[in-house]
Amino acid sequence: MALSFLGAAPTNLTRPKIDADGAWNFFGGDFKTFFISGDKEHFTSRQIFKAGSPHTGAGRGSTATPPYHYHLYQTETFAVQSGTLAYCIDGKEGTLAAGESVVIPPYRHHTFWNEVSSGTDLDVHITVRGGDNPGFDEAFVHAFCKHLSTRAESCLLILDLCSKT
């Protein structure tokens, strides 16, 4: 699956820490993802975005906010477990609270993030279904998050080096 918005691949991806409960940690633990379920028909992951983090709690500008995108084949469902999920779907913004969900069919542009004003961590289950080429599974989520986390760490290293010159 080619994702042009990712740019050139970094040469050394940051290896995530994996907790005893199976959570993969990115951005120093500010973002966690868990495998919930999956088969030929669907994939569901649990994702936790830490409030107050520049990577996961800075609103739409957070490092871990997915770019505005759409899926050719998949229907994506966001089911909020706790916290507040903010979203933009086809240019319209809104929020979801715990117990609420939204279903996004193919070809609908969207992104989502942890709503800053809630001041709480966002815990969301994300399910992707459908298409002849699902292409969205646990391996994709891990690779995408490793890529974002590595790029963020590289930027911080460059900024640190520049401040010392």
Which residues make up each language-model segment?
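Jelly-roll (double-stranded beta-helix
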Residues: 1-75, 79-165
